[in-house]
Amino acid sequence: MPNNLLPTPTPLATLLRMRPLFLGLLGFAFLTSTGISFAAPIANSLKTIRAVGAEGKGNAAAAKAWQSLAKAGADQLPVILAAMDGANPLAANWLRAAVDTIAAREKKLPVAALQKFLADKSHNPRARRLAFELIRGADAKLAAKLIPGMINDPSVELRREAVAQVLDAGKIANQPAIAVKEYRKALDAARDIDQ
């Protein structure tokens, strides 16, 4: 049969043959646009909150931004915690309140991402402490395993628990040599006078 005698496919037939490709592209476009629409408000909210200043400067805008930020999912917790890096104390309070609100609402926290955030010692010490507390609330056994590794942490707040744990080990040691070793280790790492 000659090629010119084949029936010409109708536009509908062509569209039906391309349906999987069309649906895939449509789904990709939807997911991409949705991701952008969620990421943009979070970035804008973080920027607005970080701009809050003394004497109420930016507080009204920060309150609106906080409402938007507090609706974020738990997967955004590391991003919000990272925004505490270099933030002034007022902005850090707004960010901490958003983290607390999200953590209280969400049933499952991104423990692995929080642990990665905690391990990065370049982050704000209070943000890292908050990440640790979130980990402790989600997985107390994991948090207990992390404490000994904080004995030389640059964050005094995180180091304190590790030092306290070593002091306790020295107190319960039955052998004086072990107790002295534990106390020396604790004294080398302690940064607070009361320890």
Language-model regions: role of each:
Residues M1-M18:
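N-terminal secretory signal peptides that target proteins for export/translocation
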Residues L21-T34:
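Bacterial N-terminal signal peptides
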Residues S37-A39:
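Boundary at the C-terminal end of the N-terminal hydrophobic targeting segment
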Residues N44-A74, P78:
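Mature N-terminal segment immediately following signal peptide/propeptide cleavage
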Residues S45-R50, V79-M84, A113-L118, L146-P148, ...:
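Buried hydrophobic core positions in alpha-solenoid tandem helical repeats
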Residues A60-A72, N93-E106, K116, R126-A140, ...:
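Structural detector for internal amphipathic alpha-helices that build alpha-solenoid repeat scaffolds
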Residues A72-A92:
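Short, charge-rich amphipathic alpha-helical segments embedded
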